[in-house]
């Protein structure tokens, strides 16, 4: 099921990139700004790494779209790696795969904040895939999303602004047009 959805997602992303004037794989790298990657993949590893995201990554690579995905798991309490932030900055677009546990990861939320920052600052193209979640639950932060933010607020009582920034980022990306898979 997710292989079929990954392929469909790839085709839609490829068409969207072309619609935005991105002629992959070569000409976008020859533009005034040097892009290292066509696509940065943001996803919650425990939800999709060994399934949907792997299939999507392979489908992108097979057709010449250079994609970045982080293959390492971040230990609890670690900060987001500078190399990850650099990969976001060096990407022409980002695909954010929102899954049930995405908001439970402060790392994913930090990534998302940076992705949306570069969307505003440098025109990064952002595409959202709702994988196994209802887009309305993401937008209104219900269910697992409400639970995740409650935990963040409890763990970071001194940093309410950061948690609110993450909430705002998740709401913003949920309001972008995207693709929905109800695969659960």
Segment roles from a protein language model:
Residues 1-93:
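Conserved N-terminal substructure of TIR/SEFIR domains
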């Amino acid at each position: 099921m997710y292989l079929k959805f990954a392929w469909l997602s790839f085709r839609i992303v490829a068409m969207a990139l072309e619609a935005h004037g991105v002629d992959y794989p070569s000409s976008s790298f020859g533009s005034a700004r040097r892009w290292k990657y066509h696509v940065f993949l943001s996803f919650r590893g425990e939800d999709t790494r060994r399934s949907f995201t792997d299939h999507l990554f392979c489908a992108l690579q097979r057709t010449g779209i250079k994609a970045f995905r982080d293959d390492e798991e971040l230990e609890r309490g670690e900060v987001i790696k500078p190399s990850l932030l650099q990969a976001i900055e060096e990407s022409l677009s980002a695909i954010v795969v929102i899954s049930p546990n995405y908001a439970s990861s402060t790392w994913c939320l930090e990534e998302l904040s940076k992705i949306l920052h570069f969307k505003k600052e440098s025109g990064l193209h952002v595409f959202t895939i709702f994988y196994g979640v209802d887009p309305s639950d993401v937008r209104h932060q219900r269910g697992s999303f409400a639970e995740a933010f409650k935990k963040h607020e409890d763990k970071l009582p001194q940093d309410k602004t950061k948690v609110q920034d993450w909430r705002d980022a998740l709401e913003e990306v949920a309001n972008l047009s995207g693709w929905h898979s109800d695969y659960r």
